[in-house]
A protein has these predicted regions:
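A conserved helix-loop-beta module that forms one wall/lid of the active-site cleft
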Residues: 94-155, 161
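Peripheral (often C-terminal) accessory segments that flank ATP-dependent C-N-forming ligase machineries
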Residues: 4, 289-379
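Internal nucleotide-binding/catalytic subdomain
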Residues: 154-256
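A short linear hydrophobic-aromatic micro-motif
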Residues: 121, 140-143, 173-177, 248-249, ...
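Active-site "cap" helix and flanking loop/linker of ATP-utilizing ligase/carboxylase catalytic domains
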Residues: 229-250, 255, 265-314
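ATP-binding N-terminal substructure of ATP-dependent carboxylate-amine bond-forming enzymes
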Residues: 1-110, 129
Length: 379
C-alpha cells in the first residue's frame, strides 16, 4: 500500500479548486485553498482557506509549510513561487519540471517535436520580421502568448506581422502556429500516480466558442478506433516522459484519421467535467487520489453518453431563479454552479446530462443552459 498524504494544499481559488472540495470531504482529506479573496469560488466553500496571492512566494511557502502535498487550480504560478514552495519540502504534484509544459507553450511544442508527436507546424517568433517570414509560407497564422493564456486570451489569428506587435513588444517572444482546419477538437485525459500507475478516461469531443470551451460529449461520438488509440498513446507518452502526477489533459485537433496536439493541462480540465456525473470516478476525485498517493478509481462511463454544457455569463444576473426552472424542466440534469459573479461570457457553471441518445441529450442540456443563463427564457 502506498503512503497517503492527508493534508492537501491547492494553489488558486477558482472553480477547479471548488470542485475538489466535495471529493476531498468524501475521502476525508483536509483541503486548504490558497485564494486571493474570501469571495473566490473555492474560498466560499472550502473548510480551510489561506488568503494570499498564488503569485506571492511568501503566501505559497506558508501553504507548503502547512500541508503534506500541494497541487494546482491553475498552472500559471511564477517560478519564484514554485522555488519557494520546493524549499518547504512538501510534495508538489504535478512536479514543477512537468508543470513547465503546461505553463510554457514553446517548451510544450519543443517537447512534442522531440517525442515525434504531431503538432501544427510552429515557429518561435522573436521579431516582426520572423513573423512576416512565417506568414509568407502560410498566409494566416495563429499567434499565441508563450505564458499566461487561458480561455482563448492570448490566442490571435493574424494575416500581417504588425497585428502581433503589441504582444511582441510586451513579451519579446511568441509562438506562431499554422491554422489547423480540424474536423473537430478532442480531449484525452489520463490520471497518473507518483508510482506511474495510469488510468485513461474515454476520449471526448469538445466544442470551443471564441476560444472558450462550450460543450463536451463523452465519449466522442463515432470516434475511429485508431484515433482513440492514438489519443491515449499520446497522453500516456507525455505523462510518462515528464512525470505528471494527477490529471493530464491533452487538447487535440482531429483531422480525418489523424490527431494533432493543441496544448496540455496538468490539473482537472473543462473537457473532463462530464466525469463528475458520467463516470464511476470523477476527475476531481481522481486528481486528489493521485496526488494523495491513493489508488486510482475506475474511469468507466455510467451511461452510453454524457453531454456537458458550460454556463457562460449572459443576461441573467441571479442564476438561482434560472436554475430552479432548469431543474424543473430537465429533472435528469446535474447542475454545478461556481458561486461566481455573472459577467459577460464568464464561465459561471456547467450542466451534465447522461443517457442514450446524443441528439436528445444535447437538446435538453442546451434547454437547461438557456433557462439558467438567459433572462425570460421559457421552458
Ligand atoms: N493552430 C490552431 N489552429 C486552429 N485553431 C486553433 C489553433 N490553436 C488554437 N486554436 C483554437 O483556439 C482555441 C484556444 O487555443 P488554446 O487552447 O491554445 O488557448 P488557451 O487560451 O490556452 O485555451 P485554454 O482555455 O484551453 O487554456 C483552441 O481550442 C482552438 O479552437
Ligand atoms: Mg486550450
Amino acid at each position: 500500500m502506498q503512503t497517503a498524504h492527508r493534508r492537501i494544499g491547492v494553489i488558486g481559488g477558482g472553480q477547479l479548486a471548488r470542485m475538489m472540495v466535495g471529493p476531498a470531504a468524501e475521502l476525508a482529506l483536509e483541503l486548504t485553498v490558497l485564494a486571493n479573496d474570501p469571495q473566490e469560488s473555492a474560498a466560499q466553500v472550502a473548510a480551510s482557506v489561506q488568503l494570499g496571492s498564488p503569485d506571492d512566494p511568501e503566501a505559497v511557502r506558508r501553504l507548503g509549510n502547512s500541508v503534506d502535498v500541494v497541487t494546482f487550480d491553475h498552472e500559471q504560478v511564477p517560478p519564484e513561487a514554485l522555488r519557494a514552495l520546493a524549499e518547504t519540502g512538501c510534495a508538489i504534484y504535478p512536479p514543477p519540471e512537468a508543470l513547465l509544459y503546461a505553463q510554457d507553450k514553446l517548451a510544450m511544442r519543443e517537447l512534442l517535436t522531440e517525442l515525434e508527436i504531431d503538432s501544427p507546424r510552429w515557429w518561435r517568433i522573436e521579431s516582426s520580421a520572423q513573423l512576416a517570414d512565417a506568414l509568407k509560407e502560410c498566409g494566416e497564422l495563429v499567434v499565441k502568448t508563450v505564458r499566461g493564456g487561458y480561455d482563448g486570451n492570448g490566442v490571435r489569428r493574424v494575416k500581417t506581422a504588425r497585428e502581433a506587435d503589441d504582444w511582441l513588444a510586451r513579451d519579446g517572444v511568441l509562438l506562431a502556429e499554422e491554422i489547423v482546419f480540424f474536423d473537430r477538437e478532442l480531449g484525452a485525459q489520463v490520471a497518473r500516480t507518483p508510482q506511474g500507475e495510469m488510468r485513461h478516461y474515454p476520449t471526448v469531443e469538445t466544442l470551443q466558442r471564441s476560444g472558450r470551451c462550450y460543450r463536451v460529449i463523452a465519449p466522442a461520438p463515432g470516434i475511429p478506433e485508431g484515433v482513440d488509440k492514438r489519443a491515449r498513446e499520446i497522453a500516456a507518452a507525455i505523462a510518462e516522459r515528464i512525470g505528471v502526477v494527477g490529471m493530464l489533459a491533452v487538447e487535440l485537433f482531429q483531422v480525418g484519421e489523424k490527431v494533432y496536439v493543441n496544448e496540455l493541462a496538468m490539473r482537472p480540465h473543462n473537457c473532463g467535467h462530464w466525469s463528475m456525473d458520467g463516470a464511476v470516478t470523477g476527475q476531481f476525485e481522481q486528481h486528489l487520489r493521485a496526488v494523495a498517493g491513493l489508488p486510482l478509481g475506475d474511469t468507466a462511463p455510467h451511461s452510453r453518453h454524457t453531454v456537458m454544457v458550460n454556463l457562460l455569463g449572459d443576461t441573467r444576473q441571479d442564476l438561482r431563479a434560472g436554475a430552479a426552472l432548469a431543474l424543473a424542466s430537465v429533472p435528469a440534469v446535474k447542475l454545478h454552479l461556481y458561486g461566481k459573479e455573472v459577467k459577460h461570457r464568464r464561465k459561471v457553471g456547467h450542466v451534465n446530462l447522461s443517457g442514450e441518445d446524443v441528439g436528445q441529450l444535447i437538446d435538453a442540456a442546451h434547454r437547461a443552459e438557456k433557462l439558467i443563463v438567459r433572462e425570460g427564457e421559457k421552458k
